[in-house]
Amino acid sequence: MSGSTASARNKHSKGNLKHNNNKNKNNDEPIDITKDEFERIREALGKEEFRKLFFEYVDEIQDPANRKIYEDEITQLEKERGVEVTFIHPQPGFVVKTSIDGEQKCFINIAGSPEIARPESKLDINPDTGDRGLSWSIPMAQTASRDDCDAKNQQCKVFDVVFHPDALHLGQKNSQFRKCLIDTALDAVEREYEVNLDRTNLKYPKLDYKGIARPTVIRKLSKNPTDEELEPHPLEHSFPTKPTAGEGEPKVLPMKVQKEQPKAPKFTEPKYSIKYSHDVDLSEYTNELDAKLQVTKPRALVVEIELPLLRSTAECELDVTSKSIYLLSERAGAKYRLKLDLPYTVDDKSGRARFDTDKRRLNIHLPVIRSNEPNLRLLSREDSGVELHSNSESPVEEEEDGEDEIEAEEEEEEVKTKVKPTSNPPSFLKSSLHYQLPGKFDCNLLDNCMAFTLHVANVQPDSIEYVQEKRSLHLQFASMGNGYYPTHYAFYVALPAKESQLIIENVEAEAWDNNVILKLDLNKSSESIESYLAGLDDQDLQDYAIHGQFKALKEAPVQEDKPGDIQFKRNDQEPSLEITVSGLNAVEQQEREEGEIEEAEEQQHKKSASKKQRGKRNKKERSLSESACVSLPTSVDSQPMATLKLPQRKQRSFSECHEQQHHHHRGILKRFSRYDGNDSCSSIDDCSSSYPCSVEASRSFGGIPEEDSSLSESCKKTVRFNDHIMKQVFRLDSSILGQRKKNQKRRDCKLRAQQRRLSEGDSADYEESTANKTQYCKYNKKHHHHHDSGLDLTRHNKKRELAEEADNKNSLMFEMDDDDDDEDEDLI
């Protein structure tokens, strides 16, 4: 009996001023009731007799006299067990209002009871500062937490902390002691129930007590033990007592050092949560290449902020940007401040916010900005292998070219409008991005302009931004790589310190396919600049030398040609044309006479050409040069130099010009030398002059009408084009080299078929023309002084060689025309 009594007493002696913890912690658990029990209670409450008995029981319990009898009986029973029981009845004091974990509202009743010990104080020294003061010991008692409703019938929590009435009286007289009582009560609630109270936003409503006062019990061991406890234990003196280890040594207790409590913040950070919102898009569940590119990125962000002490959003300020949310409330008793960084860039213009007055919760819905989603056409694009800057041209109609040029100009204007200088130099480069310097860049100078070429491909025009200063420029842009991952570049350029007078007036930045062109317009000439400074920013600069310096071309003075007079005389009786050229010196006249004699002999030899060569018709067209056209209208009497007899059949005219030593102007008309051994293009004006000019009668090409006396009136400057448009169609699944090989095989097969169809006589003519062609090509490798009309401008006295040369050229001309026609048919 004695052992069980001792264990029972020890069970209730763990604390002097503590109540039953198990009862407190289990108070919030829900009632476990079965369905049958609920049905029986419902049926019983439906009976009038049961309700009458139930109300009588409630009145009996609430009767103070009956409660006094109940407390006396409980005290007597506990005293028999050796435990003193004291019932504490809280007396109203004041109320503190706050919140639990930033979610639920709660009230703390600071009450008084004479059963609680009085507060005690003693003189003490602060170990940190050395100041003398009073150290208070304030006893207290706590009751179990209970649920209640506030003025708006919303659920809340209520806690009771009971002090001695003298402590409450001191709190009314001294504000510091009152604050000490409040801090002690808050610490007790947080320690006992393991919750976090909002100490920043404390309110003091005009209430003495929240709810109905409920008594609590304090249990402690009785000072007068019972008779059973006074009896000695039978085994107590059977064995000697064991001496203690520290017996005889003084006990040294460590000095208690009170840690300074951190200052309470002025604002409380409310509890919040960020939720990702996704829409059900059926296109993301397909097998397309671009179906799941944006699956991991949400459509919107939903931010929920718990504000239990606010009644509406009019009491707070909310600022939302593309990357953050800032909330501030300066209302007394509800001071909140929250600065939240968002994980994604949002559209703050399209967001919406709503405050739930029932739950005291602020809901913010912000749509997420998604980058440009690459479509299936861009993902499936493959490299065609053709360079962007190819010299090959394809025949396109003029209307399509005009439309393309207009679209290109509009795109350039849009790019120029998008590239605007940024007006925030300190934060120009974003700290969250990694920038790198272009691997290769060049600088060229021209008058007062510095042009930089940054060799970076696939630059997005809308990403170009720059900051312009007087003597420096900071540029940044982004390039899209093969994996659709942007690479950011930065380029900082500054003028050298030697050229202190130079200032940047204007800046132009333009993105191309393979590079970025940066143009700086200076206030003075840039010829004296020898180097420049470049790097990622102004802290990382290196000196680079300038290798490319150019000067603007000055207009060359126009040299007036000496006018040469040409006089034409036509004989109607005999088809002949007499040409007289004046303004030549004696040497040039002698050279011209010798050349005309050789040309006359050559014309006589051409009359004996074969009928096959006469029957063929050349489609080429020739016209007089510009210098000859200018000098044709003038006529001065002079001695005739040569007279040429012309046949009445079709004629061909050539302009033979002696090349001068210095020519400063070149015409726009180009010619192809088909009689020379090497392929070259030159201007007709290179050989044109006002002094030597002659007209040769030869076989016509069939396209130019015979010139009469109208030559002396005016000479038209015309350029003729073929009406037939050649076009080539390329298949998407084949390469250009493969089509070229296929066309070459087709031409070879056609050539072999033509050779098989040739007769014996035609084969002989073909072999003879081929031999003449080979012989002429060998001859041209040694002599390169022939004009495109076939005339030899040098003075050769060998008449036989001139005649053979003319035959070879005529035969070669018609063979080349046949080859050109065959190639045209193959292309078509």
From Swiss-Prot:
A GO cellular-component term linked to this record: cytoplasm
Organism: Drosophila willistoni
Chain intervals with Basic and acidic residues compositional bias: 556-573, 788-808
Family: Belongs to the PIH1 family. Kintoun subfamily.
Protein name in the entry: Protein kintoun
Cellular localization per UniProt: Cytoplasm
Keywords attached to this entry: Cytoplasm, Phosphoprotein
Biased composition (Acidic residues): 395-414, 591-601, 815-828
Region Disordered: start-end pairs: 1-31, 223-250, 383-424, 556-668, 741-828
Biased composition range(s): Polar residues: 625-641
Phosphoserine: residues bearing it: 384, 759
Summary of the function given for this chain in its UniProt record: Required for cytoplasmic pre-assembly of axonemal dyneins, thereby playing a central role in motility in cilia and flagella. Involved in pre-assembly of dynein arm complexes in the cytoplasm before intraflagellar transport loads them for the ciliary compartment.
Quaternary structure (record): Interacts with Pp1alpha-96A, Pp1-87B, Pp1-13C and flw.
Listed GO MF terms: protein phosphatase 1 binding
Pfam families: PIH1, PIH1_CS
Compositionally biased spans, kind Basic residues: 9-22, 606-620, 741-755
Any single GO BP term: axonemal dynein complex assembly
Keyword Phosphoprotein: yes
